[in-house]
């Protein structure tokens, strides 16, 4: 039964995606709408940098969709709006799979094995996912942002993807496969910073899922400790890693040019290769037998988040 359920789960998820995409693409804004949307459309079409703190990865992705306008800039707004529609439909897809993953834990909690799932349980899980996904599809707030060139549609997609990835890790945490999900999750978080900082709010949920998986008999004290740790992680990324990564590059550039008399961009190039060297060192360290698994995971997570950080360099030029 479990094989049939996995197939149906994938099929129903893509049905939810098609329904959402059809809804949004047929109700999408034909041109620019209010607030920041005209600015984002212009930045995507012209390769410009938007208002602080900047949304560089959003603009790069928008520029890709503007290419489908075929050089007709009058259609640029429509294509960036369509980008939001498709990413919103993608958010619905991962929302469906998230709901079914969580519902399955409740419905099948008394089953001795995964193969003990019954048809009634499978139908309950799939219908729960479809109802939840479609209710969110046609909710006023989400539908409103799904049809215009705002960062919230893209950010919602990133948020849904990140939370789904931690649930996939939770179900497959043993071995190398589980580590791959953690690495991909860290990279998506790094990229999402170039869209909107909303994605960082997933970190407390991610930390709790990780903690409960590692500590099945978790207590209140440990749960509160995990939440406090997640707050420190958010603060470190928000106030340390994001501004510090760019600020350090600027300080090295100023020292190289003003202090050492080097040509322009010397410090920036040095900093770039220095970061690459650190990442290479982390990879080399992973092959050392005396390195603990916990240290490796921390190095990999921090390094992969930094891989997404170059998209934030555009913020420094605002």
Report the location of each language-model feature:
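Aromatic- and kink-enriched transmembrane "portal" helix at the membrane-lumen/periplasm boundary
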Residues: 26, 73-81, 109-122, 129-156, ...
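Transmembrane signal-anchor helices characteristic of membrane glycosylation enzymes that use polyprenol
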Residues: 5-34, 136-138, 196, 234-239, ...
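Extracytoplasmic catalytic/substrate-binding loops of multi-pass membrane glycan-assembly enzymes
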Residues: 28-40, 50-62
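Membrane-interface transmembrane helices that cradle and orient dolichyl/undecaprenyl
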Residues: 119, 123, 162-182, 208-218, ...
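Perimembrane helix-loop-helix junctions
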Residues: 170-171, 202-228, 239-268, 272-300
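Short hydrophobic alpha-helices at membrane interfaces in multi-pass membrane enzymes
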Residues: 127-130, 165, 172-190, 219-232
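Start-transfer (signal-anchor) and selected internal transmembrane alpha helices
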Residues: 1-23, 90, 113-130, 276-308
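Transmembrane-helix motifs of polytopic, lipid-linked glycan transferases
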Residues: 14, 82-117, 161-165
